[in-house]
A protein has these predicted regions:
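Short, surface-exposed beta-strand/loop micro-motifs that present aromatic residues
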Residues: 70-73
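Short, conserved beta-strand/beta-arch hydrophobic-aromatic motifs that form part
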Residues: 84
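Basic, Lys/Arg-enriched alpha-helical interface segments
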Residues: 1-67, 77-79, 87-111
Length: 111
């Protein structure tokens, strides 16, 4: 199995909002996220079988990490789009975070 290319969401000004968020986290949280990204790049779709994932709505899914959530859409057999990342606060995704990820997916024509 070949790995997937990861496309992070960028703001209108060109800022990579995913990596900007990650850079503000503790070193331990950063390592956890970079490990997940590395596994996806190496193992492709098989990586998602090993991760704690959950379908949120339609093509929008989330990866649940120890302290954070990454909301994503599988674009095709070769690529995944990371649309939003946030702190885990409750047992489920917060409405504002879900709405933000859905809006970004629509803006990028991923839904």
């Amino acid at each position: 199995m070949f790995g997937l290319e990861i496309y992070d969401y960028h703001s209108a000004g060109g800022k990579n909002v995913i990596l900007a968020y990650v850079e503000k986290l503790s070193k331990q949280e950063q390592l956890e996220i970079y490990d997940v990204r590395g596994e996806i790049r190496r193992s492709g779709l098989d990586a998602f079988e090993k991760l704690d994932t959950r379908q949120l709505r339609g093509k929008l899914w989330e990866i649940k990490l120890s302290q954070n959530r990454i909301m994503y859409v599988i674009m095709n057999k070769d690529a995944v789009a990371f649309l939003h990342i946030c702190k885990k606060q409750k047992g489920k995704a917060e409405k504002q975070d879900l709405d933000k990820a859905l809006n970004r997916a629509r803006k990028e024509n991923l839904l």
